[in-house]
Regions:
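Outer-membrane beta-barrel signature, preferentially recognizing the C-terminal barrel domain
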Residues: 498-502, 576-629, 645-661, 666-667
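Extracytoplasmic beta-strand/coil segments of soluble accessory domains associated
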Residues: 166-202
Length: 698
């Protein structure tokens, strides 16, 4: 239907025009007032929830209810730092806050003043008047969330009393604290250690920081054994993230720890950890230093009955390392929607090692010595090796549903220098001759820089989409000096001195979607694409190494909780293990007069596919089964070549690894005794061939 309306206009008198103008002005002012009133009546509400000790309370459930119709207008949950955000809803409404163990709050929000008051909510522990009061603290249990394991309420654990975070991790399932240093998950290599979601430098510094943080200062510990598409595909060792408690406006807290390990030598260490919480500024920082000394001694005797010859081998070694480092992590809350962060970390290492090996040759049951060969190796850092890194990050909360944009810029720099002086001497009859005297001086400089941008969109509390891009570029300059003794100095051997420069870049994009289908089922699916390019230049021989790789890495996580007593999860991920520059340098490196290392510029990257199943029963029993399939594995092969021994790296085949862990935690005799035990089983099988030689290892 098409309707046409015709208007016939006539000139207006001045009085009528004046009256019309006044009406329009009044109409305009009324609209402005109504608009301002509606704007004031629909402001979003955000704030922080604290307990009686001014500590943040995570997991508080908040509901906004219409007081007239009892209609639920909006719901949300407080985050790990106690913050909550409600979307824009009309006034008035009743704000209800509930949490197990706390008295519920019902706050009427009628105007802007009420909204300002609700920006800080304080909840009190629920108290009942009983004839007899028995206070018990429920010990922490492992909780399963999509893609990770979480333990909260650390302070209630008997293992946390008087302990630091490093020692508390010894009682965590799936985690192994190695005696020689390092923390691993399910028998893998050392996991990446994060504090408050970020790296604090290398793992050695992170471990020292954990020794300085009291366990009761932890809000939660996250164990991520299988990383998803949002993480680098080269990270196959998992992540351990320690999240500290946040207490707004608490000011500065300082923790200091001194430790001493007594062996043949003394090995002291010290850690100072600082945490500052203000209205807009959060700062964590740490300083650590350690002096480690190690002494090794071994004796071996070999009798060759067929020839009647005998060999006596004596080995002595002393190692001294001085480590010092620190980091500062600063977060500034510009507003409720904008946060700026920065981090700087720095570490230094001074290294000394003296080793001596003596081989005595003679005959069985004879005191007569035919000859003695002695090898003395002195290794030291000519100057402290420095490592430093910087990070600048920005977070923009795009709405009140939890959507956000994260931007990270990173820079890392490392300098590593060693002087290795080797002296080989032969004692025969009455003569002593130095057969070889040479010096090796490897100098390696590394710089890596790049950034990452990620957008996380929350459609609602049950649907989240993550999309991200990252790009990193690195340069490694390996300058290897090999010199022969000439007087009081060493002169370069042109056939054994070399310089290798390796440049690479990695471009990645990923998408990840998480869905909560019901109270019993959650899923997460993602895919990551990486483009890797590298070029190495051997300056001595003019040889080049080129690598171009493009790979797709799918991931999938399923969490099924049929009841409060049963949790089942299945995680699948794919990863890649790329050879580092030292394995690709085509130049031969001589390590002794009779041994050398020949690298392989054609070494293939190894792709892996991992599947992990987990079952938790009654929060006290947890079974974890992890299976890993690796393709194109590589290893070092030691083979005799003429009168020399060659170490050669090559791909040889595929591998299967199975790790099973059963963890049991029980409180006995009314929580007077706490029983915790973990049993682990590991099986590895590899099969392949190198140079037509079949190899199988189980």
């Amino acid at each position: 239907m098409h309707i046409v309306t015709n208007y016939h206009l006539k000139p207006l008198s001045p009085h009528i025009r004046h009256t019309a103008f006044v009406r329009k002005l009044l109409f305009f002012l009324v609209n402005i007032c109504v608009f301002c009133n509606l704007s004031a009546q629909t402001l979003p509400l955000s704030g922080t929830i604290l307990d009686e000790k001014e500590e943040c309370i995570p997991g508080v459930y908040l509901i906004a209810v219409n007081p007239k119709t009892s209609e639920v207008l909006a719901t949300t949950t407080s985050s790990t730092d106690g913050k909550y955000v409600l979307p824009t809803i009309p006034l008035p409404f009743i704000l209800n806050a509930t949490h197990i163990g706390y008295t519920s709050l019902n706050i009427p929000i009628n105007n802007k003043t009420d909204m300002e008051t609700a920006r800080i909510l304080r909840m009190q522990v629920a108290i009942e008047q009983l004839q007899e009061v028995v206070v018990t603290a429920e010990p922490p249990h492992i909780e399963r969330e999509i893609g990770k394991f979480i333990i909260r309420n650390i302070a209630a654990s008997p293992f946390a009393t008087g302990s630091n975070t490093y020692n508390f991790l010894r009682f965590m399932p799936m985690i192994d604290i190695k005696s020689e240093g390092g923390i691993s998950i399910l028998g893998k290599n050392d996991a990446n250690i994060h504090i408050n979601g970020r790296s604090v430098g290398d793992n050695q510094m992170a471990e020292q920081m954990l020794k300085g943080i009291p366990a009761n200062e932890i809000a939660r510990i996250e164990i991520i054994p299988v990383t998803g598409s949002t993480r680098s595909a080269e990270n196959r060792n998992g992540i351990i993230n320690v999240v500290l408690k946040k207490k707004p406006d608490e000011g500065l807290r300082v923790f200091a720890t001194i430790e001493d390990r007594q062996g043949y030598y003394n090995s002291p260490s010290g850690i100072v950890f600082m945490n500052y919480a203000g209205k807009r500024v959060d700062l964590t920082a740490g300083i650590t230093t350690s002096y480690n000394q190690l002494r090794q001694k071994s004796n071996h005797s070999y009798n060759y009955l067929q020839t009647g010859l005998s060999t006596q081998s004596d080995f002595r070694e002393r190692t001294r390392t001085l480590n010092a480092g620190g980091y500062i992590n600063l977060n500034y809350n510009i507003s409720d929607h904008h946060k700026l962060g920065a981090q700087i970390s720095m570490g230094g290492l001074d290294y000394r090692k003296n080793s001596s090996s003596t081989s005595t040759y003679g005959r069985i049951n004879s005191d007569i010595v035919d000859s003695i060969y002695t090898a003395d190796v002195i290794t030291k850092s000519p100057a402290p090796n420095l490592t430093w890194g910087a990070n600048l990050n920005y977070v923009f909360k795009t709405d009140n549903e939890g959507s956000r944009l994260n931007i990270d810029l990173d820079l890392k720099n490392n300098s590593n220098k060693r002087n290795i002086n080797n002296t080989y001497r032969k004692d025969y009859l009455a003569s002593s001759v130095i057969t070889d005297d040479f010096s090796q001086r490897p100098t390696v400089g590394t710089i890596v820089y790049g950034g990452r941008a990620e957008y996380e969109h929350c459609f609602n509390s049950d649907n989240t989409l993550q999309v991200g891009l990252s790009g990193y570029r690195g340069t490694v300059d390996n300058d290897f000096f090999y010199g022969l003794r000439s007087g009081d100095d060493y002169v370069s051997d042109a056939g054994r001195t070399n310089r290798f420069i390796y440049k690479d870049y990695n471009l990645a994009g990923y998408i990840n979607y998480q869905r909560v289908w019901s109270e019993t089922l959650e899923t997460e699916i993602g895919v990551r694409a990486e483009k890797y390019h590298a070029k190495g230049s051997q300056k001595t021989t003019s040889e080049t190494v080129n690598r171009n790789e493009f790979d797709i890495f799918p991931t999938l996580s399923i969490l099924y909780m049929p009841s409060d007593d049963h949790e089942l999860s299945l995680d699948f991920t794919s990863s890649i293990m790329r050879p580092y520059y030292g394995q690709l340098n085509p130049f031969i490196t001589y390590t002794s007069p009779s041994t050398y290392i020949q690298n392989n510029p054609n070494l293939k990257s190894s792709k892996g596919y991992e599947l992990m199943f987990s079952y938790t029963l009654f929060d006290d029993y947890m079974l974890t089964v992890d299976y890993l399939y690796d393709k194109d594995l590589w290893t070092d092969f030691v083979l005799p070549i003429a009168d020399m021994t060659r170490t050669y790296t090559d791909n040889y085949g595929n591998g299967h690894a199975l790790d099973i862990s059963l963890f049991i935690s029980q409180s006995l005799f009314k929580n007077y005794w706490n029983f915790s035990v973990e049993a682990a089983f590991g099986y590895v099988s590899t099969r392949g061939a190198v140079s037509n030689r079949k190899n199988r290892l189980q």
